[in-house]
Amino acid sequence: LEHGNYMDEECISMLADSRTVWVPTLVTVKNLRGCGRYEDRVLIPIIRKAEENLFLAFQKKAQVALGSDAGAYMVMHGNGIVDEYTAFRSVLGDSDDLENWLRQGENAIKTRFRHPRF
C-alpha cells in the first residue's frame, strides 16, 4: 500500500492485522512545506496526520517499509529515501526497534515480489 494518507485508527488496526505492507511516503507532502506551491496551513494538518498514523502503525506493529516516491515534486532522486528515513526518525526516534521494524517490512516486500530464478 503506497501513500495511504488519511487513514484512521481503525484502518491502521486492520492494516496491522493483515499481511499488507504500508509504504507511507511522508516526504511527498512534508517536502512541500515552505516551497510556495501550496499554503503551509493546508499542508501542516496533512503532515501531522501522516506522522500520527506512522506512530500508530509502529505501536500496532503494522508492516511498514521505506519508500520516497522519488521524482515527485520536491522529492529528489537520490535524496528522497534519505529524507523519508529522516522523517521516520523524527517521528519515531533513532532506535534498533525502528531499524528492525523497517527491515521486517522491506523483507516482506522482497519475499512477496521475488522474481523466480530461471
List the model feature ranges, each with a label.
Residues 1-51, 65, 70-72, 92-95, ...:
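Active-site core of metal-dependent hydrolases
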Residues 38, 48-118:
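His/Asp/Glu-enriched, well-ordered alpha-helical/loop segment
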